[in-house]
């Protein structure tokens, strides 16, 4: 049986030197403002995976009010999540994502992001889809006040 989960995350942007997207540092004028490293893409993927396995959400496992997660690399959260899901008998089949960010342009980093996520998720790069779009200068994303990501994950139950 294949199970599906959906995830969504947004973070404010602040002046900075780089943005972390899918565990990949992208140089630019903005950084994500979050309790951890503010990687909205990974946070959305985590919620999608946990949802598909009916295990809750990112806040239950990594609460943003716990000091130990302050500044944490979100790949740690993702690695812990996939290990948990594997331990209860699921296999990751596919992750499909959309990153919504006005700037910087991330299309040239998609392959690198896929490779990083595939490594952390213990799967093939072909099982990770990353799409990038802008908000066409509309709303808080369009004015570069924030960014967001959507993710859908499919898991199969191992027999």
Show which residues each predicted segment covers.
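A structural signal for short, well-ordered beta-strand segments
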Residues: 97-101, 130, 151-153
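Short acidic capping loops at alpha-helix termini that bridge into adjacent secondary structure
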Residues: 124-127
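Pyridoxal 5′-phosphate
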Residues: 65, 130-134
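RNase III-family endoribonuclease catalytic core
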Residues: 2-111, 121
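Glycine-rich, mobile lid/loop segments that gate access to catalytic sites or pores
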Residues: 117
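Generic structural marker for isolated residues within well-ordered, non-membrane alpha-helices
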Residues: 114
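C-terminal edge-of-domain segments
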Residues: 141-159
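Short, surface-exposed loop/turn segments at secondary-structure boundaries that line and modulate
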Residues: 134-141
